[in-house]
Amino acid sequence: MINIEWRKDTLVLLDQTKLPTEIIYVHCTDWRQVAEAIKMLRVRGAPAIGVAASYGLILAAMEAGRLEAPFSEQLTSLYEFSETLKETRPTAINLAWAVDRVISLVKDQVESMSSMSEVVDLITKEAIIIHEEDVSLNRRMAEAGATLFEGQKNIRILTHCNAGALATGGLGTALGVVRKLHENGQLERVYADETRPLLQGARLTAFELHEDSIPVTLETDNMAAYAMQHGLIDAVIVGADRITTKGDVANKIGTYGVAVLAKFHNIPFYVAAPYSTFDFTLENGSDIPIEMRDDYEVTSLHGIQTAPNGIDVLNPAFDVTPHELVTAIITEEGVLKPNYEESIDKLRQIVESK
């Protein structure tokens, strides 16, 4: 199922807020529609919103080119539009990474250009490259992650939120590894946390695994401890929205709790994420900005009120798992293990040398 597709002058997105009961596509012809789709979670997952934002910049450049203004002022407008796109989801670093990558390319080559049509062409090519790269690195991550399970059979994986094909441009990060294990005949079953309050595990992870005929059992978030206590889980694999140089991991709210449970039950806790998820400007997870979302996501479910009027609500979209709880980080360049400051720095050197 295609979740992101660029068609001439239009970004087509699978509306993930409608899953699993409806398959509806949103057609974005304006960069503000892309920004809204990201903010409202019609497209979500750190890699996916990075890809979507890069395509959104094509539409932003088109709009800037329609302004009756000198080329330099059109460029200024494009840069302003790009900042608005970056602000839609503050925690997922892939979004800023993709936007900054595209805009940096424009600034590097702007001296050789004289019109916004040239800028549009440049951004279009780069956005397509970013999308294609995501597809490729998902496969490489899947292969790297599978090496952690060599010689094992009947593996039971617990995952939290959705780090699958719906969250990326390819196979998925955490679920990419799951798919590889299934392909190898090693996977027995996936246990998917429903992931309150927006149920990404129930609506998205269970949906895409079921569609692909991969055995999956849905559980509420507060059943993870039971599953571990009763020997139903062999490993945990999750995705990530931002990883610091220490190896602290920001991911969907509830991930930290799963990591604590895994540590207590001596179950390996793996994080699967591409290089673009690493934030080399931050050392500590406590410095990661955490997006706070609207109260109604907690006080209602599918439009039905489930809490008293006027109740105070705490609704962070993410939490941070300390690096001490992370067994290994799966990347497209291989598996990173503690000491993370050293292994992450080595990852950076490898990528920057290419």
Model-derived regions, located:
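Conserved phosphate/anionic-ligand binding catalytic regions in large, soluble enzymes, centered on
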Residues: 40-56, 89, 94-95, 162-170, ...
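Generic structural signal for well-ordered, non-membrane alpha-helical segments
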Residues: 27, 31-34, 46, 50, ...
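Conserved phosphate- and dinucleotide-binding cores of soluble alpha/beta proteins
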Residues: 187, 194-354
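Short beta-strand segments
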Residues: 14, 52, 96-98, 158-162, ...
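Ligand-binding beta-strand-loop-alpha-helix segment within the catalytic cores
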Residues: 94-156, 186-188, 192-236
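Histidine-anchored nucleotide/phosphate-binding helix
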Residues: 172-183, 259
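Long amphipathic alpha-helical segments
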Residues: 2-113
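Short, hydrophobic/aliphatic alpha-helical segments
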Residues: 26-42, 76, 147-151, 155-159, ...
